[in-house]
Amino acid sequence: IEIENVKKHFEDLKKKYSNIIVEGAGGLYVPLIRDKFYIYDLIKMWNLPVVLVCGTKVGSINHTMLTLNALKTMGIKLEGLVFNNYKGQFFEDDNIKVILELSKVKNYLIIKNGQKEISDEEIETFFN
């Protein structure tokens, strides 16, 4: 990956669209250029806010809190949390509750298992 090429394409997209979603597939510490440039570098380079997609299964509390701590330490703005693949299990409800209590994040969405769309109203509420 050549960073200058990525920058150029991003600038071209910004001219064409008012909103752009940049997916940080795999997480903050995934290398885009091994040992040189990571997903978090890309986020910081463009000063992008983050919507953190979280699981709800066992281990989600630790994983989410570690990532939130890393975002805070790096000075990266969190837009909110999206709890993905929610199946309605009692432990998922508890995990979501604990994450929200520990993180003090107020802005979140819950995406149910198999849910294909998010309503315009949900998106408006999330980003405003």
In which residue ranges do the predicted regions lie?
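A contiguous pocket-lining binding segment that forms or flanks enzyme active sites
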Residues: P49-G55
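C-terminal lobe/tail of nucleotide-utilizing enzymes
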Residues: L68-N128
